[in-house]
């Protein structure tokens, strides 16, 4: 089963190598005024390949104004049979992980058919100590409008982090606007979706996304003292979006975390181990409001 999901992950990378300029959990039509959002999601218990299991609950709060967005995410873990978990030598690996982010996003046009986009995200992921937890993620690229309904994106995304820095190409396309009736699509990396809008208020979506988060572990962590854990996953889901008016958007859905791994690094950023988890299912609720 692990080999199967490893192959599926490789296929996912090949098919979804691209970018969505619009974030996967967008605010209600991204108004220029103040905007606020909340989402919560819970995942069922998943077995760890070297012992133990856990379930996870996430809560995210975010606020923004024009080009600036500030967000906080809290992830709570419920471990079972942690004594069998070799990742932490018989102790609970961690109970809660936190992530703060500040994002600045800009865009403009070069001509009638070419737009530009750029941005920078400052991220702090940690268990209890915020020191040595900061990462920086710049991005930039161009969007080319081939037809009124078809747009292509080309750019690059970087991640400068205490462990496992990376540079990724951004290539993707966008077909029709999500506010249009009927089918629309945004295919790319790190998220992709196909949507069908029934009317101004109701739409359904099939979506998939790749996520990667890095957390600085506590000074006395049983996993890696002053080290880091990198959590990487591929999540797919089916969602219903309800937009009673332009400034409010509500989303409910179910998700499958088909591939999920943890990589542990020491305090110098050197890799110590990798742990895979079995698939798990989850439920999602999101709400966003903009003025």
Locations of the language-model features?
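Repeated loop/turn-to-beta-strand initiation elements of outer-membrane beta-barrel proteins
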Residues: 66-72, 112-116, 148-154, 180-183, ...
């Amino acid at each position: 089963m692990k080999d199967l999901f490893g192959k599926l992950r490789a296929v996912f990378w090949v098919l979804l190598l691209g970018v969505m300029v619009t974030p996967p959990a967008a605010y209600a039509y991204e108004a220029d005024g103040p905007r606020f959002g909340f989402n919560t999601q819970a995942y069922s218990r998943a077995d760890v390949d070297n012992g133990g299991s856990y379930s996870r609950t996430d809560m995210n709060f975010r606020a923004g104004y024009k080009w600036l967005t500030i967000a906080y995410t809290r992830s709570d873990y419920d471990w079972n049979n942690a004594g069998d978990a070799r990742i932490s030598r018989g102790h609970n690996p961690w109970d809660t992980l936190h992530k703060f982010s500040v994002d600045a996003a800009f865009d403009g046009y070069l001509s009638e058919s070419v737009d530009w986009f750029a941005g920078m995200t400052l991220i702090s992921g940690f268990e209890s100590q915020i020191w040595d937890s900061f990462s920086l993620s710049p991005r930039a690229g161009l969007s080319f409008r081939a037809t009124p309904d078809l747009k292509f994106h080309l750019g690059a995304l970087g991640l400068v982090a205490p462990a496992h820095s990376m540079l990724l190409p951004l290539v993707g396309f966008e077909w029709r606007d999500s506010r249009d009736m009927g089918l629309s699509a945004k295919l790319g990396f790190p998220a992709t979706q196909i949507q069908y809008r029934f009317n101004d208020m109701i739409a359904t979506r099939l979506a998939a996304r790749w996520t990667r988060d890095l957390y600085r572990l506590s000074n006395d962590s049983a996993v890696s003292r002053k080290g880091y854990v990198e959590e990487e996953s591929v999540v797919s889901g089916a969602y219903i979006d309800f937009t009673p008016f332009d400034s409010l958007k509500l989303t409910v859905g179910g998700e499958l975390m088909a591939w999920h791994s943890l990589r542990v690094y020491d305090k110098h950023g050197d890799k110590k181990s990798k742990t895979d988890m079995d698939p798990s299912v989850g439920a999602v609720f999101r709400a966003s409001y903009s003025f």
